[in-house]
Structures are given as C-alpha cells and as structure tokens.
Amino acid sequence: MSKKYDAGVKEYRDTYWTPDYVPLDTDLLACFKCTGQEGVPKEEVAAAVAAESSTGTWSTVWSELLTDLDFYKGRCYRIEDVPGDKESFYAFIAYPLDLFEEGSITNVLTSLVGNVFGFKALRHLRLEDIRFPLAFIKTCYGPPNGIVVERDRMNKYGRPLLGCTIKPKLGLSGKNYGRVVYECLRGGLDFTKDDENINSQPFQRWQNRFEFVAEAIRLAEQETGEKKGHYLNVTANTPEEMYERAEFAKELGMPIVMHDFITGGFTANTGLSKWCRKNGMLLHIHRAMHAVIDRHPKHGIHFRVLAKCLRLSGGDQLHTGTVVGKLEGDRQTTLGYIDQLRESFVPEDRSRGNFFDQDWGSMPGVFAVASGGIHVWHMPALVTIFGDDSVLQFGGGTHGHPWGSAAGAAANRVALEACVKARNAGRHLEKESRDILMEAAKHSPELAIALETWKEIKFEFDTVDKLDVQS
C-alpha cells in the first residue's frame, strides 16, 4: 500500500506541493501572497495553504480511504518571489471545480479564505487574485441588468453618469433629506445616493425617506425632462426586512436600490441581485468595510478579488475608489480591477495587478463608481481614467458649493460635458485640463465659483498598498 495511507502526521508538501501539475481550464486558480514563520520552507507553507483551503487536515485520517483525495485536493503548482520583498512569496494554487457549490461565492470564499488565514505556520497571508473558470462563471447569476441595460433604462448615453451622496449623510429628517435630493437632481445630476450607513435610524425611518425621495425625483424629472434616480439603501438587519424595503421602492416607481455587499454578505447580495432582475430594478453596490479586508499589503483579500466576486454575485454599479480623491488606490491597480468589472476578457497583466487571464464569457459588465474626495478640478482626470462606463459621484464637491447643492450639481454637469466634448474633439484632457475647465467657466458662473472654491484642495498621500512590480 502507498505510504500516503500510513497513519501519523505528514508534511503538507508531501501531498499538496505538485510543481509538475498543469492546471486545467476547469480549475479555479488562486494566487496567495504568503509570509511564513521563520525557518519554515516555502514549499511547506504554500502546501499548507493549499491543504487547509481544500481537503487537508493536520493528521492522516482513516476516512481518507473512502474518497479520492488526489482528485479533490488543492495543488500548489508554482511559487514565485515577490519583487522587493525578501520575506514573502506568491503561491499559485489550483482547485478542482467540484470543491465548490455551483454559483456560490459564499462557498468559494469560505474555502479559500476560511480557517487558513489563522494558520500558525503563516505570519501573513493575502489572497491576491482568483481565476474563475468559465464553467463556474456560467453557474453564477451576475449583474441583474448590466451596463447596456442600465443606459437604456436611464436613457443616458455617450458620457459618464453623474451623481452625489447626500450630505450630511446622517441626521436629516426624511423631508429635509428629500429636499436635498431635489436640489441636486434639478441642478443636473443623474443620480443621488444614500450613504452606506443610512438605513432606518430614529431621526429618519426608511419608509419616510423613501417617500420623500420619490417625490423629489418626480419633481426633478418634471422640471428637467430627464430620467433621474436615487440609490435607496435597502441593507437591513434581516433578509426579510431587506426585501420589504426593496418591494416598497418598487411600489414607489423607483429605478434603483442599493446594498452594502460586504457588511450585508454575499448570500444576501446574490439574493437581492436575483430579486432586482426579476423585478426590473437596478442595483447599486457600496463596498463599506472593504479596507478592513484589502488595505494591508501582506494580509487579507485584495479588492480585485472582491470586485470579481461582486460581478459574479450581482450588482450594476460598484464603488472602486477614485485614484485622485481621498481614498486609497493607485492608478494601475484601479484600472486593473475596473477591467475586471467591465470587460469580457481580461488578460494577465502584472503591471495592473492581474495575475491570470480571466474570461467572463457573456456576463454583463458593472459600472465603476468613482466616489470620495473629488471635485470639479478632478473631472478631466476622472473622465480619462474611468471612461464613459462609470458613475462619477461628488458629495462634498456638490454640496460644498457656496451657492448650494443645485449650483454644485450644475457646476459638475457643465465640467463633465466640457470634458466629454473636449475629449471627443481630440484634446488631451489631463494636459489641457485647466484650459478646458476655464473655457467652460466663462459660460457658467456656477462652475467658475466651484473652480475658485476647490482650487487648493488636494489629497496627496502615498498609496499604502502598492503593486509588487520590479522597477
């Protein structure tokens, strides 16, 4: 009998380190950044990750004889050094597709980032990327509508969509909240938004907010002749309550609802996405709590993984950071996971942080949402970075206008249309940004005041989580 059936404790690398293995098209592939305890060989650390995230346990057990672990086990098939980091290395692991329930992002993450992150042989562990096989993608529900359908629903084409978060995000009564929504929408925005932590608090119960927002949208649509929307946050303490709120939004004729997908959970998110498709509603996704998981460069889950998982779980819009605003995120990394949200096929490109080719098949794309510390001076860079299939959201950059929210919205709309017109004429937005905006401001006093107000506001901090690439 083979030694693999001998009783006792074995080194993980004897079973789970398989450098000769050639991954199958149907394998789910994962790249982990590993930092092992001192004195533990890389192969043992990597094999331990493969074991603990698939079929392994610390001891040989008799029940292994009842199945074929060689078929079901995860296999570490490659190890690479991390550029500029002598302590860490990349471990590439292949998992057979049968380890995962069809269409369940919850199950995939439970396996890949479950107990293994508490393993004593590791000082740090980070899930950098996942290659989802097309066979798995076809079992996932994906975005309830996607980019093309959303544009048709809102009747908006040829430019990024424009939005803002209502401020102050907490403390307003339902009526005053609706008033701010109206001011922003009549000023020229396409969307306004609940912030992530506005649910149903004593100062503003959710039914009250929904009703006043619906009235504000109807008035703004009548005044402007444009389709408008507001992201009504239906995140709740139970799934039943979440669906009750979504149903009420539908009854009011609202086009879109919102969910905090990390705090709410992937199971709730997938269920809500299915409901939205069935009921003809758009779904905006906020990423609240993501930085707890993704910001440490050596431990956690990279946001590109969360973005991929969200596309599979379902959402029509997802916050991605801004590059130029107040939130973490360098340009190349951000472009890398924006590609994962919108494209049908994304090739391996380490300069953008993509470790694998990713084929999305026919799955609809997701709008990238730029939000957090942005204002009119950022508009040329935002249009360049994010392109048309994006939502640019200015919270303080709308409400902070000296003339009020309507004027702030008008300034942003004029700046956006000026940038799109200049781009379409072949001008270089970032090199000519000042000239483009100042020319537009000659015909818009709202924009002129906004440019003067925000001219000194910058968020120039180094990125904590940088790409691991050789210079």
From Swiss-Prot:
Active-site residues, Swiss-Prot/TrEMBL:
167 (proton acceptor), 286 (proton acceptor)
- Enzyme class per UniProt: lyase
Give GO BP annotations, semicolon-separated. photorespiration; reductive pentose-phosphate cycle
Q: Gene3D superfamilies from the xrefs? A: Ribulose bisphosphate carboxylase, large subunit, C-terminal domain, RuBisCO large subunit, N-terminal domain
Q: Which Pfam families match?
A: RuBisCO_large, RuBisCO_large_N
As a miscellaneous remark, the entry gives: The basic functional RuBisCO is composed of a large chain homodimer in a 'head-to-tail' conformation. In form I RuBisCO this homodimer is arranged in a barrel-like tetramer with the small subunits forming a tetrameric 'cap' on each end of the 'barrel'.
Key word Lyase present in the record? yes
Entry EC number(s): 4.1.1.39
Q: What is this protein called?
A: Ribulose bisphosphate carboxylase large chain
Family stated for the protein in its record:
Belongs to the RuBisCO large chain family. Type I subfamily.
Q: Which GO CC annotations does the UniProt entry carry?
A: carboxysome
Keywords from UniProt, A to Z, are: Bacterial microcompartment, Calvin cycle, Carbon dioxide fixation, Carboxysome, Lyase, Magnesium, Metal-binding, Monooxygenase, Oxidoreductase, Photorespiration, Photosynthesis
As to how many cofactors bind and how, the note says: Binds 1 Mg(2+) ion per subunit.
| GO MF terms, alphabetically ordered | magnesium ion binding; monooxygenase activity; ribulose-bisphosphate carboxylase activity
Which residues in this protein are found as N6-carboxylysine? 193
Q: Which PANTHER family match?
A: RIBULOSE BISPHOSPHATE CARBOXYLASE, RIBULOSE BISPHOSPHATE CARBOXYLASE LARGE CHAIN
Q: In which compartments does the protein localize?
A: Carboxysome
Q: Which residues bind substrate?
A: 115, 165, 169, 287, 319, 371
Residues involved in Mg(2+) binding: 193, 195-196
